[in-house]
Amino acid sequence: MENVPNVYFNPVFIEPTFKHSLLSVYKHRLIVLFEVFVVFILIYVFFRSELNMFFMHKRKIPDPIDRLRRANLACEDDKLMIYGLPWITTQTSALSINSKPIVYKDCAKLLRSINGSQPVSLNDVLRR
């Protein structure tokens, strides 16, 4: 046999000598600040109304039923009457959905079943 020379491979590690300067934050502070500024502008443009609603004081909307809380119901014969409405000084007939007066046999008995012997306010009926 012929004499074959042996070749041995040794791993060689080469340490990189260049630096990644593009990844450095310190060199590009202005770019980062510009990006943050652009993000805030975009948030303002697209979410302006939501931000305004979040920071504005919420106005309390008055409940229209609050004006009816002092009104009371009473019976005149078999007719249901409302008195104490703020815009009407006299006793008025209670109206149904079709704008006809509410007439119910044993009207007083019905009102007693709602609130006993105490006067029945419109608020008592609306809460049920």
From Swiss-Prot:
UniProt xrefs under InterPro entries: Poxvirus_L5
Membrane topology note: Single-pass type III membrane protein
One Gene Ontology cellular component annotation held by this UniProt entry: viral envelope
Segments on the Intravirion side according to the record's topology features: 1-30
Post-translational modifications: Most cysteines are linked by disulfide bonds. They are created by the viral disulfide bond formation pathway, a poxvirus-specific redox pathway that operates on the cytoplasmic side of the MV membranes.
Parts of the chain that traverse the membrane: 31-51
Subcellular location: Virion membrane
Keywords annotated in UniProt: Disulfide bond, Fusion of virus membrane with host cell membrane, Fusion of virus membrane with host membrane, Late protein, Membrane, Signal-anchor, Transmembrane, Transmembrane helix, Viral envelope protein, Viral penetration into host cytoplasm, Virion, Virus entry into host cell
Source taxon at top rank: Viruses
Residue intervals on the Virion surface side: 52-107
Disulfide bonds: 75-107
Swiss-Prot/TrEMBL GO biological process terms: fusion of virus membrane with host plasma membrane; symbiont entry into host cell
Chief location bin: virion
Induction of expression: Expressed in the late phase of the viral replicative cycle.
Known role: Component of the entry fusion complex (EFC), which consists of 11 proteins. During cell infection, this complex mediates entry of the virion core into the host cytoplasm by a two-step mechanism consisting of lipid mixing of the viral and cellular membranes and subsequent pore formation.
Subunit description: Interacts with OPG086. Component of the entry fusion complex (EFC) composed of OPG053, OPG076, OPG086, OPG094, OPG095, OPG099, OPG107, OPG143, OPG104J5, OPG147 and OPG155. Except for OPG095 and OPG053, each of the EFC proteins is required for assembly or stability of the complex.
Family: Belongs to the orthopoxvirus OPG099 family.
Designated name of the protein: Entry-fusion complex protein OPG094
Organism: Variola virus (isolate Human/India/Ind3/1967)
